Amino acid sequence: DFQIEFIKNVIDPSTITFVIQTKYLYQIVSNDNGIDVDRMDYIMRDTKMTGLNYGVEHMRIMDNTVVEDNELKYDAKCKIPIESFFTTRYILYKEICYHKTVVSIEHHIKDILKEIDEQFSITKCVREEDWEQYISLTDNIISYIDFIPDKKLTRAKEILNDISERNILKLVGEIISDKELDIVSPNKNIVIIKTKIKYHNKELPKFVNDKKVKTLLNENVLRPVEHITKIMCKYTDNEEANALFESYL
Protein backbone atom coordinates (compact mmCIF):
# COMPACT_ATOMS: atom_id res chain seq x y z
CA ASP A 1 0.00 0.00 0.00
CA PHE A 2 2.83 2.39 0.86
CA GLN A 3 4.55 1.72 -2.46
CA ILE A 4 1.33 2.25 -4.39
CA GLU A 5 0.69 5.57 -2.64
CA PHE A 6 4.29 6.59 -3.21
CA ILE A 7 4.07 5.85 -6.94
CA LYS A 8 0.77 7.75 -7.18
CA ASN A 9 2.37 10.75 -5.46
CA VAL A 10 5.37 10.64 -7.78
CA ILE A 11 3.10 10.67 -10.83
CA ASP A 12 0.74 13.30 -9.39
CA PRO A 13 1.99 14.88 -6.14
CA SER A 14 -0.90 15.31 -3.72
CA THR A 15 0.91 17.65 -1.33
CA ILE A 16 3.44 20.44 -1.66
CA THR A 17 5.41 18.84 1.18
CA PHE A 18 5.99 15.73 -0.91
CA VAL A 19 7.36 17.76 -3.81
CA ILE A 20 9.66 19.82 -1.59
CA GLN A 21 11.04 16.84 0.35
CA THR A 22 11.48 14.49 -2.60
CA LYS A 23 11.50 16.77 -5.62
CA TYR A 24 14.19 14.81 -7.43
CA LEU A 25 12.16 11.57 -7.21
CA TYR A 26 9.22 13.32 -8.81
CA GLN A 27 11.52 14.71 -11.52
CA ILE A 28 12.60 11.18 -12.50
CA VAL A 29 9.06 10.47 -13.71
CA SER A 30 7.83 13.93 -14.72
CA ASN A 31 10.34 16.75 -15.01
CA ASP A 32 9.45 20.34 -15.89
CA ASN A 33 12.62 20.53 -17.99
CA GLY A 34 11.33 17.75 -20.25
CA ILE A 35 14.00 15.17 -19.37
CA ASP A 36 12.44 12.18 -17.62
CA VAL A 37 12.00 8.42 -18.02
CA ASP A 38 8.55 8.78 -19.56
CA ARG A 39 9.79 10.92 -22.44
CA MET A 40 12.96 8.85 -22.87
CA ASP A 41 10.83 5.73 -23.14
CA TYR A 42 8.45 6.94 -25.83
CA ILE A 43 11.14 8.79 -27.80
CA MET A 44 13.36 5.69 -28.01
CA ARG A 45 10.44 3.36 -28.69
CA ASP A 46 8.66 5.53 -31.25
CA THR A 47 11.79 6.41 -33.24
CA LYS A 48 12.68 2.72 -33.48
CA MET A 49 9.19 1.51 -34.39
CA THR A 50 8.66 4.22 -37.03
CA GLY A 51 12.13 3.90 -38.54
CA LEU A 52 13.08 7.47 -37.70
CA ASN A 53 16.87 7.38 -37.88
CA TYR A 54 17.68 9.44 -34.78
CA GLY A 55 19.19 8.26 -31.53
CA VAL A 56 19.22 9.42 -27.92
CA GLU A 57 22.23 8.87 -25.65
CA HIS A 58 19.99 8.00 -22.72
CA MET A 59 22.67 6.15 -20.74
CA ARG A 60 25.10 9.05 -20.99
CA ILE A 61 22.42 11.46 -19.78
CA MET A 62 21.46 9.19 -16.88
CA ASP A 63 25.07 8.47 -15.92
CA ASN A 64 25.75 12.21 -15.73
CA THR A 65 22.65 13.09 -13.72
CA VAL A 66 23.22 14.17 -10.12
CA VAL A 67 21.06 15.23 -7.19
CA GLU A 68 21.94 18.70 -5.95
CA ASP A 69 19.78 20.97 -3.78
CA ASN A 70 17.15 18.21 -3.84
CA GLU A 71 16.70 18.37 -7.61
CA LEU A 72 18.15 16.72 -10.68
CA LYS A 73 21.01 18.45 -12.45
CA TYR A 74 23.35 17.37 -15.22
CA ASP A 75 27.08 17.39 -15.73
CA ALA A 76 28.02 20.01 -18.31
CA LYS A 77 29.74 17.39 -20.47
CA CYS A 78 26.36 15.99 -21.54
CA LYS A 79 25.00 19.30 -22.85
CA ILE A 80 25.21 18.05 -26.43
CA PRO A 81 23.40 14.73 -25.75
CA ILE A 82 20.67 16.68 -23.94
CA GLU A 83 20.35 19.12 -26.83
CA SER A 84 20.17 16.11 -29.16
CA PHE A 85 17.40 14.71 -26.93
CA PHE A 86 15.33 17.88 -27.38
CA THR A 87 16.01 17.93 -31.12
CA THR A 88 14.96 14.29 -31.56
CA ARG A 89 11.73 14.87 -29.64
CA TYR A 90 11.00 17.94 -31.77
CA ILE A 91 11.58 16.00 -35.01
CA LEU A 92 9.46 13.10 -33.73
CA TYR A 93 6.50 15.40 -33.17
CA LYS A 94 6.99 17.23 -36.48
CA GLU A 95 7.53 14.20 -38.70
CA ILE A 96 5.49 11.48 -36.97
CA CYS A 97 3.03 12.53 -34.25
CA TYR A 98 1.60 15.50 -36.14
CA HIS A 99 2.13 14.21 -39.66
CA LYS A 100 -0.78 15.14 -41.93
CA THR A 101 -1.87 11.51 -42.41
CA VAL A 102 -1.66 10.75 -38.69
CA VAL A 103 -3.83 13.71 -37.66
CA SER A 104 -6.26 12.95 -40.48
CA ILE A 105 -6.79 9.33 -39.39
CA GLU A 106 -7.00 10.42 -35.74
CA HIS A 107 -9.81 12.78 -36.71
CA HIS A 108 -11.72 9.98 -38.44
CA ILE A 109 -11.19 7.60 -35.50
CA LYS A 110 -12.68 10.24 -33.19
CA ASP A 111 -15.72 10.30 -35.46
CA ILE A 112 -15.96 6.50 -35.18
CA LEU A 113 -15.80 6.68 -31.38
CA LYS A 114 -18.61 9.23 -31.38
CA GLU A 115 -20.72 6.93 -33.54
CA ILE A 116 -20.23 3.88 -31.29
CA ASP A 117 -20.36 5.72 -27.96
CA GLU A 118 -23.88 4.55 -27.15
CA GLN A 119 -23.20 0.89 -27.95
CA PHE A 120 -19.93 0.71 -26.02
CA SER A 121 -20.75 3.20 -23.23
CA ILE A 122 -17.42 4.99 -23.66
CA THR A 123 -18.55 8.32 -22.21
CA LYS A 124 -20.41 6.52 -19.43
CA CYS A 125 -17.26 4.60 -18.43
CA VAL A 126 -15.32 7.84 -18.03
CA ARG A 127 -18.12 9.71 -16.30
CA GLU A 128 -18.69 6.91 -13.78
CA GLU A 129 -14.96 6.10 -13.54
CA ASP A 130 -15.59 2.48 -14.46
CA TRP A 131 -11.99 1.81 -15.41
CA GLU A 132 -12.36 -1.99 -15.54
CA GLN A 133 -14.88 -1.56 -18.33
CA TYR A 134 -12.85 1.22 -19.93
CA ILE A 135 -9.64 -0.82 -20.29
CA SER A 136 -11.64 -3.58 -21.97
CA LEU A 137 -12.23 -1.20 -24.88
CA THR A 138 -9.27 -2.35 -26.98
CA ASP A 139 -8.51 -2.37 -30.72
CA ASN A 140 -10.91 -5.31 -30.98
CA ILE A 141 -13.63 -2.67 -31.34
CA ILE A 142 -12.45 -2.13 -34.92
CA SER A 143 -12.91 -5.83 -35.74
CA TYR A 144 -16.33 -5.74 -34.10
CA ILE A 145 -17.41 -2.77 -36.21
CA ASP A 146 -16.07 -4.39 -39.36
CA PHE A 147 -17.70 -7.80 -39.02
CA ILE A 148 -20.84 -7.48 -36.86
CA PRO A 149 -24.01 -6.77 -38.91
CA ASP A 150 -25.59 -3.96 -36.91
CA LYS A 151 -27.50 -1.10 -38.54
CA LYS A 152 -26.49 1.21 -35.69
CA LEU A 153 -22.88 0.81 -36.83
CA THR A 154 -23.53 1.74 -40.46
CA ARG A 155 -21.91 5.18 -40.28
CA ALA A 156 -18.96 3.84 -38.27
CA LYS A 157 -18.45 1.14 -40.93
CA GLU A 158 -18.45 3.80 -43.65
CA ILE A 159 -15.78 5.85 -41.87
CA LEU A 160 -13.68 2.73 -41.24
CA ASN A 161 -13.94 1.83 -44.92
CA ASP A 162 -12.85 5.37 -45.86
CA ILE A 163 -9.74 4.95 -43.71
CA SER A 164 -8.95 1.57 -45.30
CA GLU A 165 -9.25 3.04 -48.80
CA ARG A 166 -7.40 6.22 -47.83
CA ASN A 167 -10.44 8.32 -48.61
CA ILE A 168 -9.43 10.61 -45.77
CA LEU A 169 -8.92 14.29 -45.08
CA LYS A 170 -6.23 15.81 -47.27
CA LEU A 171 -3.98 18.69 -46.29
CA VAL A 172 -4.89 21.94 -48.03
CA GLY A 173 -2.28 23.97 -46.19
CA GLU A 174 -0.39 24.33 -42.93
CA ILE A 175 0.23 27.58 -41.04
CA ILE A 176 2.99 27.84 -38.42
CA SER A 177 2.73 30.75 -35.99
CA ASP A 178 4.00 31.90 -32.60
CA LYS A 179 0.48 32.01 -31.14
CA GLU A 180 -2.78 30.17 -31.64
CA LEU A 181 -4.75 31.44 -34.61
CA ASP A 182 -8.45 32.19 -34.31
CA ILE A 183 -9.36 30.39 -37.48
CA VAL A 184 -12.68 28.61 -38.02
CA SER A 185 -14.88 27.54 -40.90
CA PRO A 186 -18.67 27.09 -40.94
CA ASN A 187 -18.23 24.58 -43.76
CA LYS A 188 -18.49 21.06 -42.29
CA ASN A 189 -16.34 19.69 -45.11
CA ILE A 190 -13.42 21.82 -43.94
CA VAL A 191 -11.63 20.67 -40.80
CA ILE A 192 -9.27 22.89 -38.81
CA ILE A 193 -6.78 20.94 -36.70
CA LYS A 194 -4.66 22.88 -34.21
CA THR A 195 -1.59 21.56 -32.42
CA LYS A 196 1.44 23.03 -30.71
CA ILE A 197 4.99 21.77 -30.46
CA LYS A 198 7.45 22.66 -27.73
CA TYR A 199 11.19 22.36 -28.28
CA HIS A 200 11.95 22.89 -24.60
CA ASN A 201 9.53 22.27 -21.77
CA LYS A 202 8.49 24.61 -18.92
CA GLU A 203 12.07 25.24 -17.78
CA LEU A 204 15.64 24.65 -18.94
CA PRO A 205 17.89 21.90 -17.51
CA LYS A 206 20.41 22.94 -14.85
CA PHE A 207 24.07 21.99 -15.17
CA VAL A 208 26.97 21.45 -12.79
CA ASN A 209 30.76 21.45 -13.41
CA ASP A 210 30.31 24.20 -15.96
CA LYS A 211 33.29 26.35 -14.93
CA LYS A 212 35.58 25.62 -17.88
CA VAL A 213 33.22 27.09 -20.45
CA LYS A 214 32.24 30.75 -20.54
CA THR A 215 29.53 31.79 -22.96
CA LEU A 216 28.37 35.25 -23.95
CA LEU A 217 25.22 33.77 -25.45
CA ASN A 218 21.96 33.97 -23.57
CA GLU A 219 21.29 30.28 -22.93
CA ASN A 220 18.53 30.93 -20.41
CA VAL A 221 15.87 31.42 -23.05
CA LEU A 222 13.19 28.87 -23.83
CA ARG A 223 12.58 28.23 -27.52
CA PRO A 224 9.14 29.61 -28.50
CA VAL A 225 6.21 27.25 -28.85
CA GLU A 226 5.18 26.52 -32.44
CA HIS A 227 1.44 26.70 -33.05
CA ILE A 228 0.51 24.64 -36.09
CA THR A 229 -2.83 25.04 -37.84
CA LYS A 230 -3.71 22.46 -40.48
CA ILE A 231 -6.55 23.24 -42.90
CA MET A 232 -7.88 19.91 -44.15
CA CYS A 233 -10.59 18.79 -46.53
CA LYS A 234 -11.50 15.55 -48.31
CA TYR A 235 -10.92 17.28 -51.62
CA THR A 236 -7.84 19.50 -51.98
CA ASP A 237 -9.47 21.40 -54.85
CA ASN A 238 -12.11 22.80 -52.48
CA GLU A 239 -12.14 26.50 -53.39
CA GLU A 240 -13.33 27.67 -49.97
CA ALA A 241 -10.61 25.69 -48.16
CA ASN A 242 -7.91 27.01 -50.49
CA ALA A 243 -9.18 30.57 -50.11
CA LEU A 244 -9.07 30.21 -46.32
CA PHE A 245 -5.44 29.06 -46.49
CA GLU A 246 -4.44 31.74 -49.02
CA SER A 247 -5.88 34.45 -46.77
CA TYR A 248 -3.01 33.84 -44.33
CA LEU A 249 -0.23 34.19 -46.89
Where are these regions (language model features)?
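Histidine-centered, transition-metal-coordinating active-site segments
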Residues: F2-L249
